[in-house]
Amino acid sequence: MNISQEVARRRTFAIISHPDAGKTTLTEKLLLFAGAIQIAGSVKARKASRHASSDWMEIEKQRGISVASSVMQMEYRDCVINLLDTPGHQDFSEDTYRVLTAVDAALMVIDAANGVEPQTIRLLQVCRARNTPIITFINKMDREVREPLDLLSEIEGHLGMDAVPFSWPVGMGKSFGGVFDIRRDRMRVFRPGQERRSDDDDIIDGLDNPEIASRFGSAFEQANGEIELIQEAAPAFDREAFLAGRQTPVFFGSAINNFGVQEVLDALVEQAPPPGPRQALERLVEPQEPKFTGVVFKVQANMDPAHRDRVAFVRVSSGRFERGMRLKVARTNKEMRPNNVVSFLSQRRELLDEAYAGDVIGIPNHGVLQLGDVLTEGESLRFTGLPFFAPELFQAVEVKDPLRTKQLRIGLTQLGEEGAIQVFRPEAAGGTLLLGAVGQLQFEVVAHRLKTEYGVEARMLPSRYTMARWITSENPRALRKFMDANAAHIAYDVVDAAAFLIGSPAQLRVAEDLYPDVKFHAMREHGGQVFGSHA
């Protein structure tokens, strides 16, 4: 196959949801139905040492939440599917945002009992801002849940897009019998509680088939009436509207019981777009271009604790990657020749020889690559849109054993470069390192990882700071004057960008009034250190 043909069969998407909506379970079942794994590691049951394939970090196994974004690749119906499982806990929205910059579509999971929840709305706003197409899976229909028509109205109201059902539940809770595939005019009847995929599911053709009515009685009667209603009232599916983020295909099911998963997988192949062009500051990069370009959207330390490694996750933006090819790191202008590049099934890795636009590859390295780095075959490019948000919570960090100070700094540097936490180094000599986060759980995760991965017992201490703003100025003297006058509140992050640490909004307003030539930024971008959104 040539590059264009390989790109056309790629599908790269992220799974997003509110915590506990069943996202990790659905990830497992998609892998199961695609044949990538033979048995799903049920997150709820936790049989012996079996854990969900996509929850691999020690703290994730203990707490049953996804805190690092996992990447998994599988083949299904001659398509190469790159699935990115994002953090399910609300404190990790920043890492989720960065993952959403690396995908061409999103699969939104909604808990049928709770409907559209706040975290989902925030993530959907990110997708809408990027015009990312969204497929919706309404999960947990085997429980006592809300009426499907109400859920559709809520999706449309909150998300501002038309919801177009592709499948419809027959019953719910104890009377849940399966899902009716509206487009194929057939019902798939599932046996609940399966860990293994079943290739001999009961399929009943035709909405008017008397067998459905006789087997499912009043549950089917209600479903039949609702299907007739939505076929009259709901807009027809328009793929262009879907690709522009104005329509979302909706599927119902129960991931833990394998209900409705097959239909979602088929829709990802049939409806989700192949990789599209990517905007760099210099030009638009087309996926079919012959030369390789890629962006580091995530850095993960210690994927293999035995080897203390660090892997840069690179989304291939264009061309073909070949193992051992010469690549330029645009930020440093240095050359590298990665030989042991890997593809993923969560933390299980396989060496790969080639990759194409849309694929996610892992490049093991020792700090050469940072978040936002652009790799090319020689061209200088800076891709846009990979942000760091100013933290809202701060804690000082000290090491309990002074002899482990070096390990603390190494650990925090790596975790900071990975984006797990923001680390600020005070300009004032002898200042304590500060950690910045967007949610409290980040501090707990970092303390746990310092202990298990770096052998460091860290002590977290309260901080007087509540805000941070990165500072720039077109007038170097004005910036220096501000930094000298506020030296006690200046710190540097892991890429040595200067930040002003603040105790209250009033303090920020005073600084803005006194130093009009200095700009205060609530977001730092990686594309060539371009700054966005002011205070």
From Swiss-Prot:
CDD domains the record matches: RF3
Residues at which GTP binds: 17-24, 85-89, 139-142
Nucleotide-binding among keywords: yes
GO BP annotation list: regulation of translational termination
Source organism superkingdom: Bacteria
UniProtKB keywords: Cytoplasm, GTP-binding, Nucleotide-binding, Protein biosynthesis
An MF annotation (GO) of this entry: translation release factor activity, codon nonspecific
Presence of keyword Electron transport: no
A Pfam family per the record: RF3_C
SUPFAM superfamilies, alphabetized: EF-G C-terminal domain-like, P-loop containing nucleoside triphosphate hydrolases, Translation proteins
Entry GO CC: cytosol
Signal peptide stretch: none
Function: Increases the formation of ribosomal termination complexes and stimulates activities of RF-1 and RF-2. It binds guanine nucleotides and has strong preference for UGA stop codons. It may interact directly with the ribosome. The stimulation of RF-1 and RF-2 is significantly reduced by GTP and GDP, but not by GMP.
Record-stated family: Belongs to the TRAFAC class translation factor GTPase superfamily. Classic translation factor GTPase family. PrfC subfamily.
HAMAP family according to UniProt: Rel_fac_3 (MF_00072)
Stated name of the protein: Peptide chain release factor 3
Gene name per UniProt: prfC
